[in-house]
Amino acid sequence: MNIKEAIKMIQDEKLQGYNMNEERYNRENEVVLMRENDKWIVYATDERASKVTNSQDIYLDEEEALDDFIDRLRAFNRLR
């Protein structure tokens, strides 16, 4: 999966509550995908917009990071 495919999935499935590499402060209850240098970072935030302890995973491969990001986002949206 690449970024365009991930965005299409998000739109098609009407997924909400995410930050996909946006330069802004975290918001409450969202799944975050950030690129830092050559690494992809995926984590979740809580009701106070703080990073959830032990939720961060680091990937060297964009596809793996996007798969994890979409999986978490789908799970998060099922809980809403």
Provide a role label for each language-model segment.
Residues 60-73:
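A short, charged, amphipathic alpha-helix used as a generic interaction element across diverse proteins
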Residues 75-80:
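Intrinsically disordered, low-complexity charged/polar segments
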